[in-house]
From Swiss-Prot:
HAMAP family found in the cross-reference section: Ribosomal_uL5_B
Classification via InterPro entries: Ribosomal_uL5 (IPR002132), Ribosomal_uL5_bac-type (IPR020930), Ribosomal_uL5_C (IPR031309), Ribosomal_uL5_CS (IPR020929), Ribosomal_uL5_dom_sf (IPR022803), Ribosomal_uL5_N (IPR031310)
A GO molecular-function descriptor: rRNA binding
PROSITE patterns associated with the record: RIBOSOMAL_L5 (PS00358)
Superkingdom assignment: Bacteria
Record text on subunit structure and interactions: Part of the 50S ribosomal subunit; part of the 5S rRNA/L5/L18/L25 subcomplex. Contacts the 5S rRNA and the P site tRNA. Forms a bridge to the 30S subunit in the 70S ribosome.
Species whose genome carries this gene: Brevibacillus brevis (strain 47 / JCM 6285 / NBRC 100599)
NCBIfam families in the cross-refs: PRK00010.1 (NF000585)
Function: This is one of the proteins that bind and probably mediate the attachment of the 5S RNA into the large ribosomal subunit, where it forms part of the central protuberance. In the 70S ribosome it contacts protein S13 of the 30S subunit (bridge B1b), connecting the 2 subunits; this bridge is implicated in subunit movement. Contacts the P site tRNA; the 5S rRNA and some of its associated proteins might help stabilize positioning of ribosome-bound tRNAs.
UniProt keyword Transmembrane present: no
Protein name: Large ribosomal subunit protein uL5
Encoding gene (name): rplE
Amino acid sequence: MATRLKEKYTSEIVPSLMSKFNYTSIMQVPKVEKIIINMGVGEAVANAKSLDTAIEDLQIIAGQKPVVTKAKKSIAGFKLREGMPIGAKVTLRGERMYHFLDKLMNVSLPRVRDFRGISSKAFDGRGNYTLGLKEQLIFPEIEYDKIDKVRGMDIVVVTSAKTDEEARELLTQMGMPFRK
């Protein structure tokens, strides 16, 4: 069963982008390739339990098991040794990716306090979009009573678009609430 967003992409967005950017083939139309959710847990250096709760939160949000990220090199100022676990990340593709993107745009982002839209300047020049969230509470799956600490996360939406303009148009048509 294809998700609502995937169906909208194939039936409405692809023809619209083909006419707007004059693509000759349907394969030139940009698409969302993957979504990476990263949660850096700085306090995991001193308290290993905090990483477990972060991993649990991330698993509930993404619907799949996160990978623990480890420190690449030692930094004495942060009491950090090489190889210490300092965060977690999840890469979503396919069905889960569309489901998460749909949930993020239509349910989670509107729950952010004082939400007026997300910045349209956070593209990296190669058609990828990055957004930072300050708290995991905006996701409906996270229960307020169960969290030990408010944690933020980075969400990267990787598209096959060559330029930022194409990626912005793709995400706008998918329903990403950009600030006017």
